[in-house]
Amino acid sequence: MERRTFLRGAVIGTSAATFGGTLMRGAAYAAPAQNGPGPYGALGTADANGVQLPSGFTSRVIARSSQAVSGTSYTWHNAPDGGACFADGTGWIYVSNSEINPSGGASAVKFNSSGSITGAYRILSNTRQNCAGGATPWNTWLSCEEVSLGYVYETDPWGVNAATRRNAMGKFKHEAAAADPVRKVIYLTEDESNGCLYRFIPTTWGNLSSGTLQVLVAGTGTSGSFSWSNVPDPDGSPTVTRDQVSGAKRFNGGEGCHYANDTVWFTTKGDNRLWQLNLANSTYELAYDDSLVNPGAAPLTGVDNVTGSSSGDLFVAEDGGNMEICVITPDDVVAPFLRITGQSSSEITGPAFSPDGTRLYFSSQRGTSGSSSGGITYEVTGPFRTSP
């Protein structure tokens, strides 16, 4: 397998390396990632919030489903899922999807420069099973419906402009989105056991009202070269998008997606893999596969949402597993970064860093109750590294 290039940069959202166009410097990245000691050391005992963290890190709960967000009158949504952060003057905004059907959507929490909550509000309503999504360079949040023939909705993190359904981005079981400001495209994962990876090329970059939907075409192996082919009917009817192009590569349950200059990473839950597209030479390969971890048991299972930090580390959330967010370093080590205890019927969702990279936001979708009304959204603060 060829060596990979892991590209570093500031990340301010679930899928962006960035969506703001920050370029990343390269480093050799051998593959696949293997079990080893993480850069932050061992996890400590669970804190008052039930979160095990490395030394120097602390957690706080910023919102609970069905309860008013602290300091506001806004009731936080059920089943919090994918999320991203957006700079807002000296503060920032964290947006979060609601993965329920019907009456899904997305909400936002606003913070000032000291991290205090200053507001919370709805940015999308009455949609279905809003799972993950992605930020854009023009500071909107793409909220994806994880239902058959689902849509992508473009939303305003400030809640000023009405959300817009982006039909041209295709109707399928959407999961996540990642914008590539260099090629001016948006990559889209599909949560089907025989799903595909797509890219959307807007007619005009910054305007998602029209454009071309393409699907990745490649062989059946875990590495090789790839190309893109137009999807004839993005509407997906009568033939679903994944069955319209001969040779479209199949992926077992597409989940999170993350772009860093010239590289796309995305997870597949059906086989616990993290894939990598090397855009500069149009090749693909595995960045992680839990069945290839040696020695010892794989620390990362139930792969789901993925984001990155300014050090070049990837942070991958578990759907189930033992409720961890694991870190994959540029030198191919995978290790737990945090673990949530007492919530075995939940999953971790929506990891996203604040614009300055010092705070990590995420949710436990069903919390201690195992119910969508029991979701908990967290913030972790600490000495996140800025270089490998």
Where are these regions (language model features)?
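Beta-propeller domains
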Residues: 50-78, 86-121
